[in-house]
């Protein structure tokens, strides 16, 4: 007899304890490759948020006074535990997010790198001094934590993005309340378990699962001093406005429409390889995905042919299968939304040279859309204007680098942009005139390492201090200035 087991119910992590939510409302967590329900996540309430913030605030009293080297040693141990559990974490990402195991494995690496950066807290927290600002007078600047931090993270990087946030925040002496995506809560829970194993005190890291009520609870709570958010543009704008209205520091990383410019002198083999990976990796569900390729007319036919040829070789399927490159999108409604954009591109006159809709019906119950490529796209089309967040690539033909930059700069998004060329002069012009925060030269995904800021512009970011790097340290700390007079 086969015994049917119910999907696990995800609990909140508050004050070092795994507790059930006050809410009885649940949302299913699916494996997007199979459509199978793998868990039930609570849609927690503001009461749950209150409990988590209270626990974090109480823990802040002692954690903020903990010696910085001791905080760093806990993070070093945490980093080693992440390394020791690397394969398990990657598999869990693939199961609840859908991306290929190889990509999930790489995501774990990026998360580990973030913890490594945060473990440098003794250096990161250093202040500055000037011994002689006047006769017998000296001044010094000291960094201090700011209190309870709220973090709201998306489904597309369930390990990397939380690791952008809470390791650096707690390294700086703050305590943290994390609201992971309700679509991918399992990885966040595992991160908390390993943090506890590393010796992180109770209440320093808390997790409240849910949706709108949890977000609003964090944005409105007086004891939450800052909010770090990653997600879609409309929600990012909402979080920034509501958070700042409640006098909080806010960094809100939003949507993207990243342009890749291919010039006549580009290495087309390299450009093709990089664009395919950047456009279709993680099923296009990342804010640094290559969404638009702007190519000079003389080489456009060659590039389009190469891209279609390589896209046809992509293996689509369950990310746990060894040869799979392209997994599913996150949910069935996102699959239908993507198909709607493909339909729109056809209706508005773009040339569909590779139709990913043809790959949706042969993969069983999962939420699959194949690599899709449009040629002869114009900036009036929705597929050029909107963040689709799916494996859909638009190709725009131009006469010059000037025209390519002009078109890219008309986008309201400005996360990343890339150029493929062997010309130093073209690279310099691109660097100086493109309106985008993260640039790549002959690379497809110019996402910076954890020790540099993730620096989107325009409607790709709301705030003053970006995630990661010294911007992150500034965001999670406040300063005291001490001026002293010492006379004999």
UniProtKB/Swiss-Prot annotation:
A Gene Ontology biological process term: thymine catabolic process
- State the pathway, as annotated in the record: Polyol metabolism; myo-inositol degradation into acetyl-CoA; acetyl-CoA from myo-inositol: step 7/7
Reactions catalysed, semicolon-separated, are: 3-oxopropanoate + NAD(+) + CoA + H2O = hydrogencarbonate + acetyl-CoA + NADH + H(+); 2-methyl-3-oxopropanoate + NAD(+) + CoA + H2O = propanoyl-CoA + hydrogencarbonate + NADH + H(+)
Q: Which InterPro entries would you find in this protein's record?
A: Ald_DH/histidinol_DH, Ald_DH_C, Ald_DH_CS_CYS, Ald_DH_N, Aldehyde_DH_dom, MeMal-semiAld_DH, MSDH_GmP_bac
Keyword Protein biosynthesis listed: no
Cite the SUPFAM superfamilies for this sequence. ALDH-like
Q: Does the keyword Membrane apply?
A: no
The protein's name: Malonate-semialdehyde dehydrogenase 2
Protein's organism? Bacillus cereus (strain ZK / E33L)
């Amino acid at each position: 007899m086969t015994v049917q087991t119910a999907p696990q119910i995800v609990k909140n992590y508050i004050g070092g304890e795994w507790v059930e939510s006050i809410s009885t409302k649940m949302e299913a967590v699916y494996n997007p490759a199979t459509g199978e329900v793998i868990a039930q996540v609570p849609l927690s309430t503001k009461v749950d948020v209150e409990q988590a913030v209270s626990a974090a605030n109480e823990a802040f009293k002692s954690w903020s006074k903990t010696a910085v080297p001791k905080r760093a040693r806990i993070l070093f141990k945490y980093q080693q535990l992440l390394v020791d559990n690397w394969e398990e974490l990657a598999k869990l990402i693939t199961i609840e997010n859908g991306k290929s195991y190889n990509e999930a494995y790489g995501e774990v690496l990026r998360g580990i790198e973030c913890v490594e950066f945060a473990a440098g807290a003794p250096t990161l927290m250093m202040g500055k001094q000037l011994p002689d600002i006047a006769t017998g007078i000296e001044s010094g600047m000291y960094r201090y934590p700011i209190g309870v931090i709220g973090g709201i993270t998306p489904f597309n990087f369930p390990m990397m993005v939380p690791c952008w946030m809470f390791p650096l925040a707690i390294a700086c002496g703050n305590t943290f309340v994390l609201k992971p995506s309700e679509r991918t809560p399992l990885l966040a829970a595992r991160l908390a378990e390993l943090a506890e194993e590393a010796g992180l005190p109770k209440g320093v890291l808390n997790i409240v699962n849910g949706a709108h009520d949890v977000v609003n609870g964090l944005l409105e709570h007086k004891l939450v001093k800052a909010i770090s958010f990653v997600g879609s543009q409309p929600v990012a704008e909402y979080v920034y406005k509501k958070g700042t209205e409640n006098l909080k520091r806010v960094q809100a990383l939003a949507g993207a429409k990243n342009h890749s410019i291919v010039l006549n002198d580009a290495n087309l083999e390299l450009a093709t390889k990089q664009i395919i990976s950047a456009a279709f990796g993680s099923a296009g569900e990342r804010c640094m995905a290559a969404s638009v390729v702007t190519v000079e007319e003389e080489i456009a036919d060659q590039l389009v042919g190469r891209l279609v040829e390589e896209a046809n070789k992509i293996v689509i399927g369950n990310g746990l299968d060894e040869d799979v490159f392209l997994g599913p999108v996150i949910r069935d409604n996102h699959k239908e939304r993507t198909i709607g954009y493909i339909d729109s591109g056809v209706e508005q006159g773009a040339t569909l040279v590779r139709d990913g809709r043809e790959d949706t019906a042969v993969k069983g119950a999962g939420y699959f859309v194949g690599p899709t490529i449009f040629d002869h796209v114009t900036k009036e089309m929705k597929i050029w204007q909107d963040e689709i967040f799916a494996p859909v690539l638009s190709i725009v033909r131009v006469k010059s680098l000037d025209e390519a930059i002009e078109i890219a700069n008309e986008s309201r998004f400005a996360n990343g942009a890339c150029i493929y060329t062997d010309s130093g002069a073209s690279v310099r012009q691109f660097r100086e005139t493109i309106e985008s925060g993260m640039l790549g030269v002959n690379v497809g995904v110019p996402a910076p390492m954890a020790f540099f800021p993730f620096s989107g512009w325009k409607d790709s970011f709301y705030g003053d201090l970006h995630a990661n790097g010294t911007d992150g340290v500034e965001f999670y700390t406040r300063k005291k200035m001490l001026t002293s007079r010492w006379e004999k």
